[in-house]
């Protein structure tokens, strides 16, 4: 009896694999005794498209353009782009997701040219272009980066000879703005030259690409070494490499620097590509990279100078990555503002110190340091989520102005110009 049933099952499977059966429902009583759950298989192939799909009990599997993708049925119903489910004018969902049966399955599926049609139990039809599914599948997104970047050390950046953009070209032409943003997105830093050395013109420059992010330091900040704020930046001391506002829950995205005047020596700006250093850690000690991406740390800013009373706390790991493609998108590194480590047990702490030391060594390698002397008329934009900055000590009177920009608005401007961001 068992031999007969298994032989029959094997025969039916061979028929399916030869393409003789396009729909096979294992619902007969003799099969139910072999399998506790009914299994539905749908198999359609298009040689011209190299497309194969199968309908499983709990998901839809698609093989297309050398990719194997799997889609949950609720997901397929939820992302329907029909007129009743999606407003194409506002690009917003109209369907009430909570109304979708969590056990929903399509009644029929068929392929017409490059479009898949799903007919649901209530008769509603959802259609998907194969390329749209590939682009928006988890498997497709896992292979893509959100923002292409060129990682650099001092030699790589200098050999690239990335040009600065002229002030007037930046303000008056889309091409100048696009070239600037392309350089900024790729390298995490970019320069604008021939800027009148005033706070007003620096502000005008910043507003060309983004809203200015007002913080506890104001909208546009102007500082010298008078220690008017409770921060080491307001001194003549050297500053080690760091990212700013790690004590914000969302650190400021972009920083703008313009040296309006310097009557003295020293004061060069240090720039280090934090993503380049992190990549070295990933290659040499992947387990330490992973630890730095998982251990949450507190950063703190306490100020009690004159009328400036602030107590800011931000929490997050040193390295922040997207979970689906492991792409690094933010480094939160500031040894000045790191608070007490009390967010992990003792047996993790020492491993974290070891990993942090590995990253610090990479960040401090002389070959990774790019030094630049900021002068009146030359404005520097820094991706504060990627590039660390510091400075050497200086003498004499030095005036700087600048601001922070909202990251979302900078990326918005870039996308509207056709850049990937």
UniProtKB/Swiss-Prot annotation:
It comes from the Eukaryota. Its cofactor is Fe(2+); L-ascorbate. CDD domains: CAS_like. Residues 1-15 form a transit peptide. InterPro entries: AlphaKG_dependent_hydroxylases (IPR050411), GBBH-like_N (IPR010376), GBBH-like_N_sf (IPR038492), TauD-like_sf (IPR042098), TauD/TfdA-like (IPR003819), Trimethyllysine_dOase (IPR012776). It is found in: Mitochondrion matrix. The modification N6-acetyllysine is found at residue 236. Pathway: Amine and polyamine biosynthesis; carnitine biosynthesis. Its EC number is 1.14.11.8. Keywords: Acetylation, Carnitine biosynthesis, Dioxygenase, Iron, Metal-binding, Mitochondrion, Oxidoreductase, Transit peptide. Its main location: mitochondrion. It is an enzyme of class 1 (oxidoreductase). It catalyses: N(6),N(6),N(6)-trimethyl-L-lysine + 2-oxoglutarate + O2 = (3S)-3-hydroxy-N(6),N(6),N(6)-trimethyl-L-lysine + succinate + CO2. One of its GO terms (biological process) is carnitine biosynthetic process. One of its GO terms (cellular component) is mitochondrial matrix. Binds 1 Fe(2+) ion per subunit. Belongs to the gamma-BBH/TMLD family. Converts trimethyllysine (TML) into hydroxytrimethyllysine (HTML). Homodimer. This is Trimethyllysine dioxygenase, mitochondrial. The lineage of its organism: Eukaryota, Metazoa, Chordata, Craniata, Vertebrata. The gene is TMLHE.
